[in-house]
């Protein structure tokens, strides 16, 4: 197999992985679980310091297994019940008794959370204490990337800042473009990429859960009611929007099921998966074709998102849905050129969507970007595309660079303003 393809598979396996619960509070739970393990006993106090963006994305989302919202319960639950070896599934097993113990720690004023000044977008430092013993765990650059561990003030592990690599820079130094992703997905041996089919299984179960039970705003179930009442039809567009939103409903509502995440985001993993799976069902393609389309969607999303910080004022579901739309064109028998048209169309349609934290209404944003993916792939199949208008260039690679430039240079102050509004 080509070395370039091996790199691509390595990238996907690094950042397309199961995650239980919204990844920002789960980062705090993971850090707390590692700190508890380092301490050797359950702590009697926990101090949490996080970056503004991690704080923003933890304010309104439920922590799985707890029925509660926020960083304090995430950290306390991680320290009491977390599995430090489980990564983003750190809270996969937690009992009501452990939740009560975590809440008691919070009620006693023994868990503190504060924002801290840092240049890192993903940053979480947890200090766990028991008597005169103290363990510090610092996460930096990625939701499970441990940068430092200290026990009683002594360093037991550290990563040099020049060696640390944030998840957002995962494509740095890699020969990768939309065209190379497209060719790779079409030509790589099926056996090498079969693993991606787990995304369909995990995110499909989340969607089923969101349809079966009331979570969050019940976006998916509301659409189902509209179909049952004859107000809207059960066509491909509405089915994609309904089932994608339902998975996000369940995830944001604290369902105790993992999502197959994409670059640290469960919702974006959902957006990269479910529209592609439903399109594959519509066109009755083989399992192999579905796997190739999922690889195209997930790696395409990773590549586009590598052009800007992992957390920002920009809602990443937009570009994730652009990559999904590219894969949908492939499933429908369209050309590479038409797949590029789909990316251009989605970015033109919904690139103004901001991120104002992880919460129940994220399901609405997921449904918005997924509906754009359907419209855009249909337009692309008819060779209708946005080109040379606004931030959309005549070339898809230039458009992707424009998105990165807009976010890096134009949206940092937007992010600050959003966080200030949310914290007021």
UniProtKB/Swiss-Prot annotation:
Domain of life: Bacteria
Alphabetized GO MF terms: L-cysteine desulfhydrase activity
GO terms, biological process: L-cysteine catabolic process to pyruvate
InterPro entries: Ser_deHydtase-like_asu, UPF0597
Pfam families: SDH_alpha
Signal peptide boundaries: none
Similarity-based family: Belongs to the UPF0597 family.
HAMAP family documented for this protein: UPF0597
Designated name of the protein: UPF0597 protein Shew185_3080
Species in which this protein is naturally found: Shewanella baltica (strain OS185)
């Amino acid at each position: 197999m080509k070395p370039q393809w091996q790199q691509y598979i390595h990238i996907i396996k690094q950042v397309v992985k199961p995650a239980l619960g919204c990844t920002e509070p789960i980062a705090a739970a993971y850090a707390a679980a590692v700190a508890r393990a380092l301490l050797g006993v359950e702590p009697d106090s926990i101090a949490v310091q996080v970056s503004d963006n991690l704080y923003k994305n933890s304010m309104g989302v439920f922590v799985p297994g707890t029925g509660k919202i926020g960083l304090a319960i995430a950290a306390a639950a991680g320290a009491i019940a977390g599995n430090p070896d489980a990564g983003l599934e750190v809270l996969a097993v937690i009992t009501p008794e452990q939740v009560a113990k975590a809440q008691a720690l919070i009620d006693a004023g023994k868990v503190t959370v504060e924002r801290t000044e840092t240049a890192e977008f993903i940053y979480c430092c947890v200090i766990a204490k028991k008597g005169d013993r103290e363990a510090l765990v610092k996460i930096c650059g990625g939701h499970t990337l441990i940068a430092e561990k200290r026990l009683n003030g002594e360093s037991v592990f550290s990563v040099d800042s020049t060696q640390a690599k944030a998840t957002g820079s995962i494509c740095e130094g890699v020969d990768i473009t939309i065209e190379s992703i497209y060719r790779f997905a079409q030509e790589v041996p099926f056996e090498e990429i079969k693993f991606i089919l787990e995304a369909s299984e995990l995110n499909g179960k989340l969607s089923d859960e969101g349809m079966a039970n009331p979570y969050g705003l019940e976006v998916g179930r509301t659409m189902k009611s509209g179909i049952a009442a004859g107000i809207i039809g059960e066509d491909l567009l509405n089915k994609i929007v309904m089932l994608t939103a339902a998975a996000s409903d369940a995830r944001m509502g604290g369902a105790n099921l993992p999502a197959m995440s994409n670059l640290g985001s469960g919702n974006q993993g959902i957006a990269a998966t479910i529209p592609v799976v439903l399109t594959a069902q519509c066109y009755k393609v083989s399992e192999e074709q579905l796997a190739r389309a999922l690889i195209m969607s997930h790696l395409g999303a990773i590549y586009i998102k590598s052009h800007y910080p992992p957390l920002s004022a920009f809602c990443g579901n937009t570009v994730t849905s652009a990559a999904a739309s590219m894969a949908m064109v492939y499933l429908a028998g369209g050309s590479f050129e038409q797949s590029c048209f789909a990316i251009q169309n989605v970015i033109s349609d919904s690139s103004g969507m901001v991120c104002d934290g992880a919460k129940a209404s994220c399901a609405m944003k997921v449904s918005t970007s997924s509906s754009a993916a359907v419209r855009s792939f249909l337009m692309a199949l008819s060779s209708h595309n946005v080109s040379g208008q606004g931030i959309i260039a005549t070339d898809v690679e230039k458009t992707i660079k424009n998105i990165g430039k807009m976010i890096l240079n134009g949206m940092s102050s937007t992010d600050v303003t959003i966080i200030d509004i949310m914290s007021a």
